[in-house]
């Protein structure tokens, strides 16, 4: 079968989704002046607020590198300040010291191996920190496989880590990578004891209503045809694992290990700041809630019992992967700015973890 170029496939996907999104207006207007929210099950461990300290770290990094990187964006323009976020103390702490002793495994999202050149989160930023001595590696999960299948792959990667005495092992999950990590922690409890912390970036913690719509209509095969032929062998379960119905039910019946420390960074953006190929799915999700990133609702991205680091003003791809550098309607200046901000964001996340994991709860 003839395969179209990637931009064409993505445009076809957007047009296809339009048929099922309709054009009715959102019931709730876009308003960032709301409190932080999480959709969770009764009895779930509460999310606690760590936004003030993370904002301090990111904003100081931004100010320190603004001139060197040629960035003009304000910190509050990049990190949303919802109306319940406490104000920082008058005397702020200094930036934490780097801790190259952290061992970090990055688990990418769905379709990551299908678009290998753009599917790995924070590639440039991770390389910079590797040069500082950090051990940062990617877990080669299967982009079209289920979370149980990828949990097995993560287990293999965790088991191979040569950790020093008391060396922290951090699992960083992006998008469905977070879902895969949570399944690993529950399914492989002995190996899970090697894990110190889990950091979720735009994580599909509860799944997404988008997948329920498409899976219910049995469009899985159609989506598979859109993806390139270089996807690795898989069990085809990616959509089931991203289903809000399936994942939320799983989460409510599978308590997460209590010895692991959890951190969540969420995303949402205005329609005009969403990449072209996600605007149709944004409009679909907008009917449920306008605070979404084009793939996930903002209230579906927080791990129960995690520390909430903040909300990034970015769409689902821009926050972690360089999709717009390959396929984008944005001008080159904006693309370059987003790439630089992504690097600073990754460093801020690692600095926050270094500080947090150096002290007990």
Where are these predicted regions, by residue range?
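Bacterial N-terminal signal peptides that target proteins for export
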Residues: 2-12
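Bacterial N-terminal signal peptides
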Residues: 11-22
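Flexible, membrane-associating and regulatory peripheral segments of lipid-active enzymes
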Residues: 23-117, 361
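Active-site catalytic motif of lipid deacylating hydrolases and related acyltransferases
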Residues: 95-169
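Serine-dependent carboxylesterase/thioesterase catalytic core
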Residues: 152-252
């Amino acid at each position: 079968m003839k395969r179209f170029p990637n931009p064409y496939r993505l445009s076809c996907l957007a047009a296809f989704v339009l048929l099922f999104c309709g054009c009715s207006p959102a019931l709730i207007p876009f308003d960032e002046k709301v409190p932080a929210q999480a959709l969770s099950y009764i009895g779930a461990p509460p999310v606690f607020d760590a936004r003030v300290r993370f904002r301090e770290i990111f904003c100081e990094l931004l100010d320190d590198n603004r001139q060197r990187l040629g960035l003009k964006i304000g910190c509050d323009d990049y990190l949303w300040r919802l109306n319940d976020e406490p104000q920082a103390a008058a005397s702020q702490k200094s930036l934490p010291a780097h801790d190259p002793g952290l061992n970090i495994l990055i688990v990418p999202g769905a379709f990551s191996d299908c678009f290998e050149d753009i599917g790995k989160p924070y590639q440039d930023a991770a390389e910079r920190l590797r040069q500082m001595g950090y051990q940062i590696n990617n877990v080669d999960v299967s982009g079209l496989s289920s979370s149980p299948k990828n949990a097995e792959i993560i287990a293999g990667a965790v088991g191979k880590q040569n950790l020093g005495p008391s060396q922290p092992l951090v699992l960083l999950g992006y998008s469905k990578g977070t879902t895969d990590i949570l399944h690993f922690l529950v399914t492989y409890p002995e190996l899970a004891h090697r894990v110190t912390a889990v950091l979720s970036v735009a994580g599909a913690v509860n799944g997404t209503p988008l997948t329920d719509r498409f899976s219910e209509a049995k469009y899985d095969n159609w989506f598979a045809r859109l993806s390139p032929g270089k996807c690795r062998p898989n069990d085809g379960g990616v959509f089931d694992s991203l289903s809000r119905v399936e994942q939320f039910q799983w989460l409510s019946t599978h308590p997460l290990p209590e010895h692991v420390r959890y951190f969540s960074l969420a995303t949402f953006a205005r329609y005009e700041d969403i990449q072209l190929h996600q605007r149709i799915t944004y409009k679909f999700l907008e009917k449920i809630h306008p605070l979404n990133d084009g793939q996930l609702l903002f209230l579906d991205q927080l791990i129960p019992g995690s520390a909430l680091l903040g909300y990034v003003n970015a769409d689902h791809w821009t926050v972690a992967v360089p999709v717009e550098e390959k396929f984008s309607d944005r001008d080159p200046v904006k693309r370059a700015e987003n790439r630089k901000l992504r690097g600073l964001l990754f460093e801020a996340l690692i600095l926050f973890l270094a500080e947090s994991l150096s002290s007990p709860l």
